[in-house]
Amino acid sequence: MLKLFGLEEIDMFELEKLVRKNVLKLKPYSSARDEFQGSASVYLDANENPYPASQYNRYPDPHQVKLKQRISGIKSIPSDQIFLGNGSDEPIDLLIRAFCEPGVDSVLIPQPTYGMYTVSAEINNIAIKTVKLTPDFDLDVTAILHAVDVNTKLIFLCSPNNPSGNLLSFEKVKQVISGFTGLVIVDEAYIDFTDYAGFLPLLNQYPNLVVLQTLSKAWGLAAIRLGMCFASFEVIGILNKIKPPYNISLLSQQAAEAGLQKIQQKNEWVKEIIAERKRMEKELTQIKSVSKVYPSDANFLLVKISEARSVYHQLVSRSIIVRDRSNVILCDDCLRLTIGTPTENHTLLKELKAL
C-alpha cells in the first residue's frame, strides 16, 4: 500500500487486474511463421504466391527480430521489452484496447497535448478525464492523482510535450508513476532533441511505466511509420497478443534497419535543428506581432502572435504551412512552427515580418 501527497492509500500495481478479462482469455491469432523460427527451404503455409515479384511475395517477419535487435543495441533495452507499431499511434490504440473496457473505464490526459490520445480513446468508447497543465505547461501532480479513480486505467504524458515543446518535470512524472495503480505512458517522440536520457533507464524500476519513441522525428523516417513501445515484457506480451499478425511491412523493416545504421547522420541533423531552433527563437522575439516564444526541447516552437488565425491563413496563401494551435487550451493566439532547413526558416521569418 502507498500513501502519497496526502491522498488516500492505494493498492500497488497489479497487471492482471488491469488487463481486460477478455484479453487475458484471448487466444491470439497465430501463423505458422509464429510457430516456426528460422528459415525454411519450402514455405507452403500462408497461401502466398510462390512466384516472387521481386522479394515481396512472402509475408514479413511478424516479430521483426532483426530490427528489434538493432533497436535493442541502440537503446540498451532487451528485445522482449520492445513492441514495434505502425507509428506510435498503433501502440497508443492497442494499449487502450487491451486495458480499457468500453463504456466502463477511463484514461487521463493532461491538456494540452498530442491529440491522438483523445481520438483513440473516443474511437474505443473510453471516457476521458482531463487535467490542465500549469501555465508553464508542467504537471499538476495533485490534481492528476485526485482526478483518477478505480476505473482509470491509463495516464498519457508527452515529454517533450506537443504542442508546447517543453520537457515535463522528471520528478513530477515519477510522482505520477508512483502514485497511480494503472499504466503511465510517457510519449518521448521528441526526446532526441534534448540532452535528457528520458525514462527508458527507469523501465525496470517501474512495472507500470510504458515509454513511446519514434523514428519519425530525429531519424527522418516519418514516411515508413515506425513507432517504438518499451515496457515490461509482460505488457509487451499483451500488445503482441492483440496486434495484427504482420503489422510492420518488409519495406518498413528494411528502411528502419538501414536508417538506424546512420546514427552519426541523425546526430548531425539534431545538432543542426537545435542550432536553428535557437536562432529562430531569437529572431522571432524581434518581430513586433510576436509576444512570446515558449522554451522548447523539441524540433518546433510554440509562438504567441497577434491574430494567430489570420496569420496562419495568410501564410497558407503564401504556400507556407504551419500549425494553428490558437483553439487549444492554454494556447490562445499560438502557432506551432516546425524547425525546417535554414532556407525554409528564412522564408518563414521573411513572410512573418512582411505581414
Task: Please give the residue ranges for each predicted region.
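Phosphate-binding glycine-rich loop
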Residues: 68-106, 124
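PLP-dependent aminotransferase class I/II
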Residues: 208-286, 293
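Conserved PLP-binding catalytic core of the aspartate aminotransferase-like
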Residues: 274, 286-318
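PLP-dependent enzyme catalytic core of the Aspartate aminotransferase-like
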Residues: 6-11, 317-318, 327-355
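N-terminal "arm"/small-domain region of PLP-dependent enzymes with the aminotransferase-like
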Residues: 4-74
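Active-site pre-lysine segment of PLP-dependent enzymes
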Residues: 122, 139-150, 163-184, 188-221
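Short acidic capping loops at alpha-helix termini that bridge into adjacent secondary structure
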Residues: 78-82, 103-106, 151, 188, ...
